[in-house]
Regions:
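Short alpha-helical donor nucleotide-sugar binding micro-motif in glycosyltransferases
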Residues: 137, 254-255, 262-267
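A short, active-site helix/loop in glycosyltransferases that binds the activated sugar's phosphate group
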Residues: 138-176
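Acidic donor-binding loop of glycosyltransferase active sites
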Residues: 265-280, 293
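Conserved acidic donor-binding segment of nucleotide-sugar-dependent glycosyltransferases
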Residues: 310-323, 330-337
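A conserved mid-protein helix/loop that constitutes part of the nucleotide-sugar donor-binding site
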Residues: 19, 23, 194-217, 231-237, ...
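Short hydrophobic beta-strand element within catalytic cores of glycosyltransferases
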Residues: 290, 294-299
Length: 370
């Protein structure tokens, strides 16, 4: 069995979808399934390379606009190589991959769509893209969604529910190493404090303003540490100053991957305050679960975030945009930490990378009748 993943980018470029593509490709390869990736690279020329056994066709980008790439070599390369593969596993949203597949000799191929999220922000461009997307949805043999919630509420998928297969994202514990010296340093820096950790790009849909405001309702021995950079940083700093929360909320900026695990390990609870379905899954919750850290997140309509965080098992799910509810949930978890002693077990059974790979291989075998 030979599988070609159509991805937007690929490692060493680091992103959420790219990591999922890598984990599935490498995991399937370890089970004897030949896996390759077609992706846009960040170089001025196209080239091929092997990474951890996965063959990557890296294609030059001619133009980048509204989070999408135009790459003539991507379209040409797919036409050249598609005959070598049994299954085309296309990761969306990615208009370029969709277009390339349309112009390829796809007729005798099995096609799996991996629906990572709807297109939420670029609404005008989406209208132009819709006919091509609908063609692909009709042509696909199966559609993977990362949660039952996303499949249920996505307007784009409503007419194709019979094709949906639910395969949650999984992460690999081997990618997360704790430095005990860093953990000790964090505890010393915030000595006597209950640590609430949060992480993500500082953008509107992440809802960090509500987490900052929640600090007004927290005791003085609580501190919120927010990792990440983004366009909302100045707004958050002004909010912290306005409410005089300098001793309760710290914006840490970018945290290196080598240090991230240590921040999770040092925290008492993790908070994902996202408010829009642009946050389709919330992989960062899995990272907290891995370290047996319970999570407070929001029940976002049409998003899988609240489904991933099982209420009263792995954490507490609250309504979005309510700072007081966030604060109340954070206090409840910290005051009854023993209730969430099995968070890591919940992770291992549901969100370990091996679970994702096994379910994906099962689907591959189903659609080619092995």
């Amino acid at each position: 069995m030979k599988v070609l993943h159509l991805s937007k980018y690929y490692k060493p470029y680091s992103g959420g979808i790219e990591q999922v593509v890598a984990d599935i490709s490498e995991g399937c390869l370890s089970k004897g399934i030949d896996s390759s990736v077609l992706a846009v690279n960040h170089k001025t020329n196209s080239y091929e390379y092997d990474l951890n056994g996965v063959h990557v066709y890296g294609c030059k980008s001619n133009y980048h606009y509204a989070s999408a790439d135009v790459s003539i070599s991507y379209i040409i390369k797919l036409r050249q190589i598609i005959e070598s593969f049994d299954i085309i596993h296309i990761h969306l949203p990615n208009p370029l991959a969709n277009l390339a597949l349309f112009f390829s000799n796809y007729k005798n191929k099995k096609i799996i769509i991996h629906w990572h999220s709807d297109i939420v922000k670029q609404k005008k461009l989406k209208m132009l893209y819709m006919p091509l997307q609908q063609w692909l949805l009709k042509r696909a043999d199966a559609i993977i969604t990362t949660s039952p919630v996303y499949g249920e509420f996505s307007d784009d998928l409503r007419k194709h529910k019979n094709k949906i297969k639910i395969i949650p994202i999984g992460i690999n514990p081997e990618n997360y190493k704790v430095d005990t010296n860093i953990v000790k340093k964090i505890h010393e820096q915030y000595k006597g404090k209950k640590i609430i950790f949060s992480l993500g790009r500082l953008v509107y849909y992440k809802g960090f303003e509500y987490l900052v405001e929640s600090a007004k309702f927290l005791p003085d021995d609580y501190i919120i540490l927010i990792g990440g950079n983004g366009e909302e940083k100045q707004k958050l700093l002004e909010l912290i100053q306005r409410y005089k929360l300098e001793d309760k909320v710290k914006l840490l900026g970018f945290i290196r991957h080598e240090e991230l695990s240590s921040y999770f390990a040092a925290s008492n609870v993790f908070c994902l305050p996202s408010i829009e379905k642009s946050e389709a899954f919330g992989v960062v919750q899995l990272e907290a679960f891995l370290f047996n850290i319970p999570v407070v997140s929001c029940d976002i309509k049409g998003s899988g975030v609240g489904w991933v965080n099982k209420n009263n098992v792995s954490g507490i799910v609250v309504q979005p945009k309510f700072p007081y509810e966030l604060a109340d949930a954070l206090k409840k978890i910290i005051s009854d930490r023993d209730k969430y002693a099995d968070v890591k077990k919940y992770f291992t059974e549901n969100f370990h990378v091996n679970v994702m790979v096994e379910r994906t291989i099962k689907l591959y075998k189903e659609i080619i009748n092995i």
